[in-house]
């Protein structure tokens, strides 16, 4: 039975801990010059309905470093649900590659793709969530845990618009038993459906969440996180209107960092619009870990690919006798036939 990674809602806290541990172990090995060929001869199909920098490069590099290959399918090269149905696309690609990743415009597309594919499917981002970012962020927070604290002791504050990254950060922090705050303006906060899912996580993990427009909510934060201000509302608000909503109250500047605390770390999924949601002083400052965070997109994707492929193959083991027979038959054919 194959396993997909469409949302962390289908993963346990323990599984996420394991994914972090695996990812960081592989990272350590590669830093020391050992590239474990855990995906040798494996191929990844990458479907992009939207352009990407970090996601595409991370998946391609991960496959290369671990002995496999990534095939990039650019916007316009493949049409999910266009001329060919999603069902047919997933069935065909399931026979051509070993694992699929898709960055889609609508979440139902990745759900349909995963339901129809016979191989593991990874959500590279949708309009609902960004689960690969979640895993990378979790790896980053584990690496930068405040001295003497466990994950469950940490407070994570997301500042600004309720983007899919904001929701995903809420999902992963509440799943891990952390304390999550969304500090954003009314009308741009996590909605009731989002909050219900965070509450469900908290019931299991013992974590907490708060949605507020109170600026004092950043106080005592271990991690302060922001994203661009134009994510979900680009077509609805002009730049001038966005600035009126978010600036200056929701800009992460040095004053906000100081209010959070001297040891608070700054995070951003990138790309950042410097001068809007964050100042140069903060993003380039000593407490900024957003570039470690960007590196950990690769770190976490390596671990995720290995986990999904190993789990899949463990449940679908190759028949070694048939494999040996096929090898022998091919060798005999090549020895006895000529063109």
From Swiss-Prot:
Optimum pH is 6.7 with 10 mM putrescine and 10 mM carbamoyl phosphate, 7.8 with 0.2 mM putrescine and 0.2 mM carbamoyl phosphate, and 9.0 with 0.5 mM putrescine and 10 mM carbamoyl phosphate. GO terms for molecular function: amino acid binding; ornithine carbamoyltransferase activity; putrescine carbamoyltransferase activity. One of its GO terms (biological process) is arginine biosynthetic process via ornithine. It is found in: Cytoplasm. Keywords: Cytoplasm, Polyamine biosynthesis, Transferase. The keyword Mitochondrion does not apply. It comes from the Bacteria. It catalyses: carbamoyl phosphate + putrescine = N-carbamoylputrescine + phosphate + H(+). Its EC number is 2.1.3.6. Putrescine binds at residues 268-271. Changing residue 54 to G: Loss of activity with putrescine and ornithine. The record marks 27, 143 as: Important for structural integrity. Gene3D superfamilies: Aspartate/ornithine carbamoyltransferase. Inhibited by spermidine. Inhibited by N-(phosphonoacetyl)-putrescine. Inhibited by N-(phosphonoacetyl)-L-ornithine. Pathway: Amine and polyamine biosynthesis; putrescine biosynthesis via agmatine pathway; putrescine from N-carbamoylputrescine (transferase route): step 1/1. The keyword Oxidoreductase does not apply. One of its GO terms (cellular component) is cytoplasm. Carbamoyl phosphate binds at residues 52-56, 103, 130. Its main location: cytoplasm. Homotrimer. NCBIfam families: orni_carb_tr (TIGR00658), PRK00779.1 (NF001986), putr_carbamoyl (TIGR04384). Catalyzes the phosphorolysis of N-carbamoylputrescine to form carbamoyl phosphate and putrescine. Is involved in the degradation pathway of the polyamine agmatine. Also has weak activity with ornithine and cadaverine. Belongs to the aspartate/ornithine carbamoyltransferase superfamily. PTCase family. This is Putrescine carbamoyltransferase. It comes from Enterococcus faecalis (strain ATCC 700802 / V583).
